[in-house]
Amino acid sequence: MSKKYFYPVIFEPEEVGVYVYVPDIPGCNTQGDSLEEALEMVQEVIGLMLEGKKPEEYPQASKPNEINLEGSQFVMMVAFDKLAYDKKYNAKAVKKTLSIPAWLNNLAIDNDINFSNLLQRALINELGLNAR
């Protein structure tokens, strides 16, 4: 179910830290004190820039060898995992209204069934996320 999207990211080492930007996603840039931090930050900012879009609306990734670089810039392909991003940044619980037969509701209540927990487990299983 989860798919990773790969984008070429331009890293530009500076006197202090590393500036990074994603040419395929307008306005998608950040920086870090180290290469590792910049890599972590760019994965987060890709998620922020794609927030609210469906995967089919994500920009097409350029080919890394077609990107023009200057000076000490270099390109790395960076993976964006929407499921991992959502688990980290969109874990807030939301209310859902559902309808079930009264007899089933009564039986579940009599057996101390936690509806929220049951629905979460059922959705995880139905979506094939139980192995992740």
PLM regions: where:
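Short, charged, surface-exposed hinge/linker loops at domain edges
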Residues: M1-F6, E44-N111, N117-R132
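Short small/polar-residue motifs
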Residues: K4-V9, G27
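Short aromatic-glycine-(Arg/Gly/Cys) micro-motifs in beta-strand/loop hairpins
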Residues: I10-P23
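Short, proline-centered helix/strand-breaking motifs
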Residues: P23-P26, P101
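A short, exposed loop/beta-hairpin motif centered on an aromatic-Gly-Thr core
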Residues: P26-L35
